[in-house]
Amino acid sequence: MTTTLPAYDEVVARYEPVIGLETHVELGTNTKMFCGCPTDFGGAPNTRVCPVCLGLPGSLPVANRAAVEATIRIGLALNCSIAEWCRFARKNYYYPDMPKNYQISQYDEPLCVDGYLDVEVDGEPVRISIERVHMEEDTGKTLHVGGATGRIHGATESLVDYNRAGIPLVEIVTKPIPGAGAMAPEVARAYVTELRDVLRSLGVSDVRMEEGSLRCDVNTSLNLPGEQWGTRTETKNVNSLRSVERAVRSEMIRQASVLEGGGRITQETRHFHEDTGDTTSGRSKETATDYRYFPEPDLVPVAPDPTWVAELKAALPELPRLHRRRLQQEWGLSDLDMQSILNAGAVELIEATIAAGATPTAARKWWLGELSRRANEAGVELADIGATPEQVAELQGLVDAGKLTDKLARTVLEHVVAGEGSPAKIMADRNLEVVSDTGALTAAVDEAIAANPAIADKVRGGKVAAAGALVGAVMKTTRGQADAKTVRELILERLGVQG
């Protein structure tokens, strides 16, 4: 089998990818899915548990109405049909973090089916079909101690915390997505991005991928044009938007390498490694038969009242696509400008910066310029760069007030990103404020003129452009803390020349 990985362009020239995504969303309810234990994060291990979520004999679950309502709202926002009748099922498997040795989920009768989510990739619309949206409970958490990677291999002991067991989850499963071609990684990222925005607008979850409240499994397969779809792999728990895109691309390249070497793709789960961008084998992928699903005997079926569903639909908030369209009109942006904001993942950041007092133009300038550059260099999402919308608005306010030049503002922003505090504090602590003392500026200008008589004579003789050298000398004297426009005006005034 070949060990040489083909170039991505070679992969998409020869093979057609098919992708699919399974997304687990941790709902922001106050209590667990089937008991009254609190869901808030951070308690000591095994303190947020009870006989129900520990699966002790004789305990009986009761479905959380708030979780059912949140699931219906998600289904409606994803254009799903809401079942008139659905029921829970037991998904049987054995693992230390599963106290009952089964998970209460839904199988053949989910709450929401046959929806879709429209996304945009490079300005082109793509419709992603949703197969199902169903409720289930989360598992506990296993901590492997002693291994170098935090995994079971090499660990000396494993500890189990059941605080997370029973937390309400919603699983959103797409139908297979063929036809994306070379854009398959971008389509996957666009879908998860749009889904995250929809969930956030509904207020059903904080959808923090880095904290696990939004977890994404990516299915990938390759086939030759005109042939049956290939064997798929499932890359588990991809924890950032950037990683979703990288995981699809990496797995496409890996599968092509296997196929080109005469090998066969194994149906399995795989782990994505953030540091290398590679996937490694996890375990063989189970089928539905392996889980021995059967109806949950301890829970009655759920039959949402159509009137209730209609009320929930009528109360849905403005969803992200309509929200962005309205903002584009309010901000007076072209489709291309709006697309650049979408591509950077900056809609909410810019909107919040405007709400904090900045103009749309200024907010776009900072988030799509200096901050995007820093995020790309650091390999992080723009929202994680270390600056808040409020800080960016404050920074622009200092520029507008004449206390900072754009150059000084970029210096201040560097320290904001480093976590040193607010722009005003950094400006004061580092003495970065624009020199506004007229006497000090006049002295610096006179010094520059005296030190450069030949240049001064050129300016007096009508070569006004030569004043740039004198401006540079003053800026050097003031360590860049003077306003260049003000300095130029003062130089021309002192030389008796009109600008």
Curated annotation (Swiss-Prot):
> What processes does the entry annotate via GO biological process terms?
glutaminyl-tRNAGln biosynthesis via transamidation; translation
Describe the reaction catalysed, as an equation.
L-glutamyl-tRNA(Gln) + L-glutamine + ATP + H2O = L-glutaminyl-tRNA(Gln) + L-glutamate + ADP + phosphate + H(+); L-aspartyl-tRNA(Asn) + L-glutamine + ATP + H2O = L-asparaginyl-tRNA(Asn) + L-glutamate + ADP + phosphate + 2 H(+)
Q: Which organism is it from?
A: Salinispora tropica (strain ATCC BAA-916 / DSM 44818 / JCM 13857 / NBRC 105044 / CNB-440)
Which SMART domains does the entry link to? GatB_Yqey
EC assignment: 6.3.5.-
Question: What is the name of the gene encoding this protein?
Answer: gatB
Q: Record's PROSITE patterns?
A: GATB
Q: Which InterPro entries match?
A: Asn/Gln-tRNA_amidoTrfase_suB/E, Asn/Gln-tRNA_Trfase_suB/E_cat, Asn/Gln_amidotransferase, Asn/Gln_tRNA_amidoTrase-B-like, GatB, GatB_Yqey_C_2, Gln-tRNA_amidoTrfase_suB_CS, Gln_synth/guanido_kin_cat_dom
Q: Which family does it belong to?
A: Belongs to the GatB/GatE family. GatB subfamily.
Q: What is this protein called?
A: Aspartyl/glutamyl-tRNA(Asn/Gln) amidotransferase subunit B
Q: What does this protein do?
A: Allows the formation of correctly charged Asn-tRNA(Asn) or Gln-tRNA(Gln) through the transamidation of misacylated Asp-tRNA(Asn) or Glu-tRNA(Gln) in organisms which lack either or both of asparaginyl-tRNA or glutaminyl-tRNA synthetases. The reaction takes place in the presence of glutamine and ATP through an activated phospho-Asp-tRNA(Asn) or phospho-Glu-tRNA(Gln).
